[in-house]
Amino acid sequence: MRTKNSKIINSEQDIFRNKVIPIKFLSNYNNEILKKPQWMKIKFPVSTNKIKNLTLILRQHNLNTVCEQALCPNLAECFNRGTATFMILGSICTRRCPFCAVSHGKPSLVNKNEPQQLARVIFDMKINYVVITSVVRDDLKDRGAQHFSNCIQEIRNKNNVKIEILVPDFRGMMRESCKIISMNPPNVFNHNLENVPRLYKLIRPGASYIRSLKLLEFFKKLNPNVPTKSGLILGLGETYKEIVHVINDLLDHGVTILTIGQYLQPSSKHFPVQKYITPDEFKKIKNYALSIGFKKVFCGPLIRSSYHAEKYFE
């Protein structure tokens, strides 16, 4: 059953509200650091030469990756394979989510040369599948949609690659932003719901569960041949019943690719892990999602939204 649309608050008021939101934890949540189970142990590659080389290339071209900014647990593996998820529009987010490691505050000016720089690096690295994401830019009139479109166009002008974009919610400009991106549509359109609606005020201040669903649905309506994708991170206090509800909502709004992974606390200043989901629990969730009609489901402790993203086309 679809959820009714919600009222969108004035964007300038939203921006101010996000600047003053304190990260605080409620007394009915576990604030203790849970011991990591064995299945969360990460194996690092023996050689780090490829990691160093890729990092050097990124710095030379003044490019950011969400792998680094969000402290992704798969960074070593992906960098060692020569892959990365590029983060455009700077490294400073205009929102402050207590589960996220990306820096927040007053963002920098948009680098107009970034699309060309990005296309050049992708060409030099001989990448066949690229994932592009961004920080939230509530300060920009179009929320960064035109910059996404410019990046896609520049990459296609220079490279024969498949492009996946992982976008923010374009608050207050959702329809306009989707139309802009539809001028240069990606091969896959991704927007993460992150978690269940009950926890949104706590972990996603400034975001709206309904708005995110509407974004995915509207883009699919404009681009029926482009697969839409979304992801969740678990271990924030959600229940299995709530997870199932979100999975149903995503399918009902046209999403066919799903990623689900374990939340990891970036630092002691971030929201603490409430539970480590077991591999068997992840398997149960994956089987449910596949049983109701999802085409691809990547579900496991270390899964992230862009992890092995190219496998959708295999």
Curated annotation (Swiss-Prot):
Cell compartment(s), UniProt: Cytoplasm
Pfam families per UniProt: Radical_SAM
Keywords, sorted A to Z: 4Fe-4S, Cytoplasm, Iron, Iron-sulfur, Metal-binding, S-adenosyl-L-methionine, Transferase
GO terms of molecular function: 4 iron, 4 sulfur cluster binding; lipoate synthase activity; metal ion binding
Pathway field: Protein modification; protein lipoylation via endogenous pathway; protein N(6)-(lipoyl)lysine from octanoyl-[acyl-carrier-protein]: step 2/2
Catalytic reaction equation(s): [[Fe-S] cluster scaffold protein carrying a second [4Fe-4S](2+) cluster] + N(6)-octanoyl-L-lysyl-[protein] + 2 oxidized [2Fe-2S]-[ferredoxin] + 2 S-adenosyl-L-methionine + 4 H(+) = [[Fe-S] cluster scaffold protein] + N(6)-[(R)-dihydrolipoyl]-L-lysyl-[protein] + 4 Fe(3+) + 2 hydrogen sulfide + 2 5'-deoxyadenosine + 2 L-methionine + 2 reduced [2Fe-2S]-[ferredoxin]
UniProt GO cellular component terms: cytoplasm
InterPro entries given in the database record: Aldolase_TIM, Elp3/MiaA/NifB-like_rSAM, Lipoyl_synth, rSAM
Main EC class the enzyme belongs to: transferase
Cofactor: [4Fe-4S] cluster
Binding site residues for [4Fe-4S] cluster 1: C67, C72, C78, S306
Major place of residence: cytoplasm
Stored Gene3D superfamilies: Aldolase class I (3.20.20.70)
Keyword Flavoprotein: no
Cofactor annotation comment: Binds 2 [4Fe-4S] clusters per subunit. One cluster is coordinated with 3 cysteines and an exchangeable S-adenosyl-L-methionine.
Residue stretches making up the Radical SAM core domain: 79-295
Enzyme Commission code: 2.8.1.8
PROSITE patterns in alphabetical order: RADICAL_SAM
Binding site for [4Fe-4S] cluster 2: C93, C97, C100
Keyword Kinase: no
Similarity comment: family membership: Belongs to the radical SAM superfamily. Lipoyl synthase family.
Protein name per the record: Lipoyl synthase
Organism: Buchnera aphidicola subsp. Baizongia pistaciae (strain Bp)
